[in-house]
Swiss-Prot record:
Protein name per its UniProtKB record: 4-hydroxy-3-methylbut-2-enyl diphosphate reductase
Protein family according to the UniProt entry: Belongs to the IspH family.
Alphabetical list of InterPro entries matching this protein: LytB/IspH
Cofactors required: [4Fe-4S] cluster
UniProt KW Transferase keyword: no
Lineage start: Bacteria, Bacillati, Bacillota, Bacilli, Bacillales
Length: 314
């Protein structure tokens, strides 16, 4: 089968940095145990499973505060999505060692919110409700940050502040953000704009919007909790006009999706391990509609291949 390997795809620098930070923590014998990650370090189950094998445990829950309530000792790692100042303070009050793996692009948004609050602004924040990145951002200044996910949410806003700025979750689709920002401008004509689509997210979305046009089908390799992976599938369908499916790994690929397909495009979310994507590409490249011997789907990437290699400190 013809395979278009969409480029760029896969890991971004923020994800790699977060994984290296966590891997170094696993190797650092001076850190108090146990070591916990507050939520998924990045939104990919293969990564969290691999870290558990390294002795780093992922804790889950509806929000970071409730997750932190599960921890009474040891070390906590804040994920790439960032956390609120309240979470940091509680971790400190509990006497926990805290390691920060927040993506620098997320930190920029937190800094912006602090600056805007100091200058008397209210902030409209476009993001996905229930996602940890907006949770952390809103938590920076909950009294002046208003979370919206849809144009309908914008219509329900009732903000009387004279100074208003709109920003967004870094992994949103730039097209989604544009439409919601236009709605904000319609309701609040004097609003200021500060779009925060991270460059890695933007170039991956743009690559899909152009390169997927040449395919009959797009396969996005990414975890169901990965917002940027889900957005890539959305971009393929809504912008490139190409049907898309998101899969966690090769085991989730359905052969019936390939019926009548001559060319398939493959991309991956920013938190998807490269070996997982390569396995999908290899299968599709050898797949032949006429040869049943090429139809067997078998996911075989071992956990020790998932994490970046880091040298132990001497």
């Amino acid at each position: 089968m013809n395979v278009i390997k969409i480029s760029p795809r896969g890991y971004c620098y923020g994800v790699v940095d977060a994984m290296v930070i966590a891997k170094n923590a696993a190797l650092d014998k001076s850190l108090p145990r146990p070591i916990y990650i507050l939520g998924m370090i990045v939104h990919n189950k293969h990564v969290t499973d691999a870290f558990e094998k390294e002795g780093i445990y992922t804790l889950d829950g509806p929000n970071r505060l409730e997750i932190l309530n599960q921890v009474d000792k040891g070390t906590v790692i804040f994920t790439a999505h960032g956390v609120s100042p309240e979470v940091r303070k509680i971790a400190e009050d509990k006497g926990l060692v805290a390691i920060d793996a927040t993506c620098p692009d997320v930190t920029k948004t937190h800094d912006l919110i602090r600056k805007m609050k100091a200058e008397g602004y209210h902030v409209i924040y476009i993001g996905k409700k229930g996602h940890p990145e907006p949770e952390g951002a809103v938590g920076v200044a909950p009294d002046i940050v208003h979370l919206v996910e849809t144009e309908e949410d914008v219509e329900r806003l009732d903000i009387e502040a004279e100074k208003l700025i709109v920003t967004n979750q870094t992994t949103m689709s730039q097209w989604d953000v544009h439409d919601i920002m236009e709605k904000v401008k319609e309701k609040y004509p004097d609003v200021e704009f500060h779009q925060e689509i991270c460059l890695a997210t933007q170039v991956r979305q743009e690559a899909v919007s152009e390169q997927a046009k040449k395919a009959d089908l797009t396969i996005v390799v990414g975890d169901p909790k990965s917002n940027n992976s889900n957005r890539l599938a959305q971009v393929s369908e809504e912008i490139a006009g190409t049907k898309a499916y998101r899969i966690g790994d090769l085991s989730e690929l359905k052969l019936e999706w390939l019926d009548g397909v001559e060319t398939v495009a493959v991309t991956a979310g920013a938190s998807t391990p490269t070996p997982i994507t390569k396995e999908v590409i290899r299968f599709l490249e050898q797949f032949d509609h006429e040869d049943p011997s090429t139809w067997k789907i078998s996911h075989e990437v071992p956990l020790h291949k998932i994490l970046p290699k880091v040298k132990a400190k001497t």
